[in-house]
């Protein structure tokens, strides 16, 4: 018993010494608090802007290195991402900004600051508290004023969705942004017709020609050589005048990272430990002799399961709005294959119409849809006689393409029109 007490006492002493040393390390680190707001010009310069009815909003999401430089601390380490806002209230009334609409899990300034407090540095801790507090975005927007600050949101990679809501007396204005986040390379940022089709005439289609053109496209994606059919091209997105990514990121979709050494290592790690990897790369598929322009996905808690969409910008517009053709399918697991470099591939669910319907519902729930319809073009395949993709996974479909027209402003479900085009299987005449 005496020996046990002696060992216990020694263990307590060692633990106390460890705590003292750790506290000293934290304290020393806390004195190195050196924020540099002078570098904010970089993210302010790339801020996106929207305006309506006397209100002008600018927004920018900070990357990991930008936030560490500006705030003097590694906020990303704790899953925190500042979003810079500037709101000009050019009206005659005081307005109010509601930060919870941008990020329901946003952090308070004291909550952020406390994560970097030192054990023996009350003065430095107080300086941190004041610094983070003074930089938060105020909620009150005086008449004829410009108000700036930060919302301490949850960390996102690739694209950060920002829903900015400003309220006044009998008025409500909303501004939606899909803000690029500096850092890793992603598939889908900065895609423009001028860069994809340099020197080409982009033809604007009316509704009848749009339907015919979309139905005339090939059934499927291709391999890099253009010889073999891959997943079916079962999706078309007609963007609004705004950013086509907004409806997707508003519903929790993430851009996929480009396939490089870093993303391969992270993919292998997530696969071994069955971890979540929200921005994992997708294998390339080809349309117009090029791989996808945009790759989006919604992942579950394991890298093995996700729904993903690939999009290609077409050389056409509708009412001067970009037209994207693509495919949507769902990964339901992983299997061995000799068709890929790492001898494994995701297995897709065979009912690709289910995934098409899921995407339609998701976009409808975003509110950013003005109308939708279906066109021919994929070609039907039954469950008893399915087609296969490039890695041999079978799939069946009614053969139709979903065509979704996006809207700049949110709409209620009752305001969204369905075009009287083709009717997908599973919908009766009453759906017409």
Predicted features along the sequence, with ranges:
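A cross-kingdom signal targeting lumenal/periplasmic-facing segments of multi-pass membrane
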Residues: 81, 88, 259-430
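Low-complexity, acidic Ser/Thr/Pro/Gly-rich terminal tails and inter-domain linkers that flank the onset
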Residues: 37-76
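Short, solvent-exposed beta-strand/turn "edge" segments of beta-rich domains on protein surfaces
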Residues: 67-82, 90-94, 140, 225-226
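Short solvent-exposed strand-capping/beta-turn motif centered on an Asx-Ser/Thr pair
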Residues: 88-93, 156, 240
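Short, hydrophobic/aromatic beta-strand segments
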Residues: 93-101, 163, 245-249
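Terminal, regulation- and interaction-focused segments at domain boundaries
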Residues: 217-247
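Surface-exposed edge beta-strand/loop patches
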Residues: 29-31, 136-199
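The feature marks short-to-medium sequence segments in extracytoplasmic or secretory-pathway proteins
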Residues: 90-142, 147
